Design a protein with these regions (language model features):
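Short, solvent-exposed turn/loop segments enriched in Gly/Ser/Thr/Pro and often Arg
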Residues: 78, 117-122, 143-145, 150, ...
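Structural recognition of the beta-strand scaffold that forms the well-ordered cores
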Residues: 46-50, 71-75, 115-116, 138-139, ...
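Extracytoplasmic/secreted proteins, especially bacterial periplasmic and envelope-associated proteins
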Residues: 54, 58, 86, 99-102, ...
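A contiguous active-site-proximal alpha/beta segment in oxidoreductase catalytic domains
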Residues: 136-138, 144-221, 226
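Contiguous beta-strand/loop segments that form the cofactor/metal-binding neighborhood of enzyme cores
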Residues: 178, 190, 195-201, 205-417, ...
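Short, solvent-exposed loop/turn and secondary-structure capping segments
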Residues: 58-62, 83-87, 124-129, 149-150, ...
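N-terminal glycine-/serine-/threonine-rich beta1-alpha1-beta2 phosphate-ribose binding loop
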Residues: 2-139, 151-163, 471
Length: 473
């Protein structure tokens, strides 16, 4: 398509158009005998990017750096705003859209994969429509806004046989391969306790609100109706957009949803933690029904799994809510590959995000993303130096892994089947923060047994009129 591309905006496609599109393209995946592979004629994966500014810009550059992706479409609800201009300049020939529904209507057959870097609450409808049409999906973390959305996304990955990767990039780096090798070799065994922490400043620190923000005029570049997607109706306010959505229970998932997937993801997968049977808000400082607390300590209690003992994972956020650390804890080193915060502070005086894992006879200190574990104290590390297993190098980074999975050459390391339960753990934590109450979760019935309102929050907010269909794909 030429640089004089048409931009579609505002008016949503008809329900008939939507359902016809899903029925026609979705049938391809149900008829396919196995996994759907991208079939780009030039050997590249034809990619549509949803969310092209802020974090989206970083994801696009990393995806394109693999040399495996061909950009066919760009979609952003605030197309032409300052934060979108660099990407627009990099790909002048790509089709442009403000509404992902129009993008699928007009270009669905040209798209192999969709990359979703929009705010947390709008991941779900884009990913569900893409998967229902047999498109592979790369979705930034966390996968969805609610426990139910995440459940449906896992089901869709399986139903439509697509490659689906969540964007916790460390899941393809050294920490991933080391953690797996050390568990397989019995170096990490019988873990009973994990401390995870993220104590940098966040957007909502210092905020005081008594309700929703007042109505402001919608900027001419922004399609507010499409930005809201399935979320409940809100009047526009600049305090909701460009990262500010992270502060609000209605739109974001707080420090836990933002960072948990980078800190305890490998522990969750390789220790097979699954879902907790109890979540206890030990500390909630500055509780609000609208924005995330100024600090929180949450205890997630996971039951025994076969021969593995129960595990208590304790999460700490808030600038002054520092975790108790073992005396041997070494000076942490922040992973240089972590993207800088778009707002807030990564103050070097504050404890960098990380974790401590207490296992049978050994204690492990770790950071975030791809940073590797170290055994503490150093004397024990020296004793074990010759007994540690070889750790394989990664065959691909997280973006290459996804695109190779689209082509049937690798499996997604953070597939929705793997990342989904991790995100559901965090979704339960967000409910505990929101209500400031202990949750008793029954993994068999997948319900919260002790609190009616909390149980209702598993489903999330009801979708706005006209957006119900994404829950039926």
């Amino acid at each position: 398509m030429s640089s004089k591309t048409r931009m579609y905006s505002s008016s949503s496609p008809s329900r008939r158009s939507f359902l016809t599109s899903v029925a026609t393209l979705g049938a391809v995946s149900t008829l396919a005998p196995g996994f759907l592979k991208a079939q780009a004629a030039n050997g590249l994966v034809n990619v549509a990017y949803c969310g092209i500014g802020n974090r989206g810009e970083q994801v696009i550059k990393s995806m394109q750096a693999t040399g495996l992706a061909n950009v066919v479409a760009l979609c952003d609800t605030d197309m032409g705003a300052p934060h979108t201009k660099e990407v627009l300049g990099l790909f002048p020939g790509a089709a442009r859209f403000q509404d992902f529904r129009r993008m699928f209507d007009k270009m669905g057959r040209r798209i192999d994969a969709v990359v979703v870097s929009t705010p947390d609450f709008s991941h779900f409808p884009i990913a569900m429509l893409a998967m229902s049409q047999g498109k592979h999906v790369y979705c930034e973390k966390p996968m969805g806004q609610s426990f139910r959305q995440i459940e449906l996304m896992m089901q869709a990955e399986h139903k439509y046989k697509v490659a689906a990767q969540m964007g916790n990039q460390g899941h393809s780096d050294a920490n991933y391969h080391q953690f797996k090798a050390w568990v397989d070799a019995g170096i990490i065994r019988n873990v009973t306790r994990i401390t995870a922490f993220m104590n940098n400043s966040r957007r909502w620190h210092g905020m005081k609100v008594s309700g929703r923000l007042p109505k402001q005029a919608v900027p001419p570049s922004l399609d507010w109706e499409s930005w809201l997607a399935t979320a409940a109706e809100h009047d526009y306010n600049v305090g909701y957009v460009n990262g500010e959505w992270r502060s609000w229970f209605d739109f974001g998932n707080g420090a836990l949803g933002d960072w948990g997937a980078h800190i305890f993801d490998t522990a969750h997968e390789f220790l097979e933690l699954g879902l907790p049977n109890e979540v206890v808000p030990v500390v909630i400082d500055g509780h609000s029904p609208y924005i995330f607390p100024q600090a929180s300590t949450l205890a997630f209690r996971f039951p025994a799994r076969g021969s593995r003992p129960p595990v208590e994972l304790t999460w700490y956020d808030g600038q002054r809510n520092l975790p108790p650390l073992p005396p041997e804890f070494a000076a942490p080193v922040a992973d240089p590959n972590i993207p800088p915060p778009s707002r807030g502070s990564a103050d070097a005086k504050v404890l960098p995000p990380g974790k401590v894992i207490y296992a049978d006879g050994l204690t492990f200190q770790g950071g975030t993303h791809g940073s590797t574990l170290k055994i503490i104290p150093e004397s024990k590390a020296l004793d074990l130096a010759g007994k540690l297993p070889m750790v394989p190098s990664s065959t691909s980074n997280h973006f290459e892994n996804f695109l190779l999975a689209c082509q049937g050459e690798e499996r997604c390391r953070s597939s929705f089947a793997v990342a989904g339960p991790l995100c559901q753990v965090m979704a339960l934590g967000v409910i505990a923060q929101r209500l400031n109450t202990t949750l008793a979760f029954d993994s068999t019935t997948r319900k919260i047994a002790n609190h009616k309102v909390a149980n209702e929050l598993l489903a999330g907010a009801p979708p706005r009129k006209g957006w119900e269909q994404y829950y039926k794909l």
